[in-house]
């Protein structure tokens, strides 16, 4: 192994960067391209911010659902309507 200039930052050492740029392809060759590609593509690990999912807004005419609930009959009491016997 050849000596490395100690003044160089570790990420600038020869051999630390792949010769080709990373791509968005998920084939086997590209998944094993470099350590970053392996962790993100092959293992599916990403430490970036997660995108917030937007809640689906109901359509503008959604008031009919609320109206239909109020038109439903009230629940009927179950059991003996005269009450408990003593």
From Swiss-Prot:
Crosslinked positions (Glycyl lysine isopeptide (Lys-Gly) (interchain with G-Cter in ubiquitin)): 71
Single Gene Ontology MF annotation: metal ion binding
UniProt-annotated stretches for the region Core: 38-48
One annotated Gene Ontology cellular component of this protein: extracellular region
Segments for region (Disordered): 1-20, 47-86
Effect of residue 51 to A: Strong decrease in Tat transactivation
Modified sites of kind N6-acetyllysine: 28, 50-51
Compartmental location: Host nucleus, Host nucleolus; Host cytoplasm; Secreted
Biased amino acid composition, Basic residues: 48-58
Family affiliation: Belongs to the lentiviruses Tat family.
Assembly, per entry: Interacts with host CCNT1. Associates with the P-TEFb complex composed at least of Tat, P-TEFb (CDK9 and CCNT1), TAR RNA, RNA Pol II. Recruits the HATs CREBBP, TAF1/TFIID, EP300, PCAF and GCN5L2. Interacts with host KAT5/Tip60; this interaction targets the latter to degradation. Interacts with the host deacetylase SIRT1. Interacts with host capping enzyme RNGTT; this interaction stimulates RNGTT. Binds to host KDR, and to the host integrins ITGAV/ITGB3 and ITGA5/ITGB1. Interacts with host KPNB1/importin beta-1 without previous binding to KPNA1/importin alpha-1. Interacts with EIF2AK2.
Protein name as catalogued: Protein Tat
The organism's taxonomic lineage, starting at the top: Viruses, Riboviria, Pararnavirae, Artverviricota, Revtraviricetes
Gene behind the chain: tat
